[in-house]
UniProtKB/Swiss-Prot annotation:
Belongs to the universal ribosomal protein uS3 family. Pfam families: KH_2 (PF07650), Ribosomal_S3_C (PF00189). This is Small ribosomal subunit protein uS3. GO terms for biological process: translation. One of its GO terms (molecular function) is structural constituent of ribosome. Residues 224-246, 274-341 are annotated as: Disordered. Residues 285-303, 311-333 have a biased composition (Low complexity). It comes from Acidothermus cellulolyticus (strain ATCC 43068 / DSM 8971 / 11B). The keyword Signal does not apply. Residues 38-106 form the KH type-2 domain.
Amino acid sequence: MGQKVNPHGFRLGITTEFSSRWYADRMYRDYVKEDVAIRRMMTRGMERAGISRVEIERTRDRVRVDIHTARPGIVIGRRGAEADRIRADLEKLTNKQVQLNILEVKNPEIDAQLVAQGVAEQLSQRVSFRRAMRKALQSALKAGAKGVRVQVAGRLGGAEMSRTEFYREGRVPLHTLRADIDYGFYEARTTFGRIGVKVWIYKGDVVAGRDHEAARVAARVQQRAVRGRSARREQPAAESPALETAAPAVAEPGAAAAPAAAGADVPVVADTAPAGQGAAERPVAEQPVVTAEPAAAAAVTGETGTGGSNAAPAEPTTSAAAEEAPGGADAPSDATETKEG
């Protein structure tokens, strides 16, 4: 199928674009006829200008015509006289305001339409078709084309029987949709009849359509990931003052080392006493435990009730008395002496 179909229409929307860009409902037929008439006017009146293609874009009250040519000076004319004439003819044909843009083809040696037109002009001047084809091949390959195929058909050399001959150099993958293949056709008028010239030029593969969209989406995702990483790097720096203010509330180094060494989770009880009267936080396992007999406990309670809050230094004496109480029979007398004193 790729050998027979027009390469431009076969790859439309993949590597090639529409030559006419407009939308119409009822006027569709009239617009198509106008486009054909515009292109016919450009090709017939200016064969020497080397026009490659004509792009047409329509709006409600304006028509934009882009002319791609290898010789813009011929299209513009002296002081723009030729361009003004073309614009006037187009406005008369379309009955609308016409915006005319003349664009230069940077590399005409690899433009298929211009190459076909050049070969046809040489055939019209009775140049050998083989020489014209080989010259076109060499110039296109030197200009950077990866593959070229030139085909001529008709009464070649004035023969009574028409035939088709072609020359090819490099790769011309007509079945590959991603291949950027330019196609051109032109007819040479000779004394023996018309000779058709077709040119295929392979310029390389083009990433388009879904592949291009997937690459664009991947780039957006990568940008978002980079932004997220930068935000994460800036977040600890913003929270560092809060960590510094909470640092004084951490337990003492000796107290914090014991639970970590034991390997168990020890609940921490926060001290609600005012500052200066106790530790801020202390593990439950390290809280002082007072073990005393009922009598000693009553004595301590009595002293605490009479002494008030200043009786806190008496805890070491009470704990010492509690440790000596189970030792012998003199424990009650010691407790009595302590109470009398």
